[in-house]
Regions:
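Structured aminoacyl-transfer and RNA-binding surfaces used for tRNA recognition/handling
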Residues: 1-203
Length: 203
């Protein structure tokens, strides 16, 4: 039995990582057999719209700030934002996330409330960054949403590998380098000047 002493989200992340590492170790030692031809799908729904950031002392969006709350939970945005479920969803296959998406907020008043009252973004910042969107919503935007799938993850599962680097034609290294194209390559001073970028190389 394992115990984790931390905040709920951090404890879950630690124990989840421990579960995966333990399974990998047992498999390596021949104590556990993982079948790659047994497909177990799972939809993750109803997870919190907001998470509390202790460092910033405020709520942050669990998925993104445009995710719509579950209708019957919307009233809790004022009193208990952490209890509000979001209309976001992930599809998982054999423990690997294949895709995720959400239903978006389409009412200007609700979006403004999320920005200013819950996320504590100053009104002037909201107006400068998202004013165009809030105005567009006043013309009657319909409910909308979507989902994005990771085809590379699907192929990795079909091939029985745990790393998408094994199935990508030109995978990058952990440092973001493309070994085939030898990129990234150094940029010239002229290119940096055109983009008004100054670099400071550590000694």
């Amino acid at each position: 039995i394992f115990f984790a002493a931390a905040g709920w989200e951090k404890a879950c992340a630690i124990l989840g990582r421990l579960r995966l590492d333990s399974a990998a170790l047992l498999q390596k030692r021949g104590k556990l057999t993982v079948r790659h031809d047994d497909w177990k799908f799972l939809w993750v729904i109803d997870f919190p719209l907001m998470s509390y950031d202790e460092a910033e002392n405020r709520y942050v969006a669990t998925h993104h700030p445009f995710t719509a709350p579950v209708a019957e939970d919307a009233a809790l945005l004022d009193s208990n934002p952490k209890a509000v479920r979001g209309q976001h969803y992930d599809v998982v296959l054999n423990g690997m996330e294949l895709g995720g998406g959400s239903i978006r907020i389409h009412q200007p008043a609700l979006q403004k409330k999320v920005f200013e009252d819950v996320l504590k973004i100053p009104a002037e910042v909201v107006e400068s960054r998202f004013g165009y969107m809030l105005k567009a919503f006043t013309y009657g935007a319909p409910p909308h949403g979507g989902i994005a799938f990771g085809l590379d993850r699907m192929v990795a599962l079909l091939c029985g590998t745990t790393s998408i680097r094994d199935v990508i034609a030109f995978p990058k290294t952990q440092k973001g380098q493309d070994l085939m194209a030898q990129s990234p390559t150094p940029v010239t001073e002229r290119q940096l000047k055109e983009l008004h970028i100054t670099t400071v190389i550590p000694e």
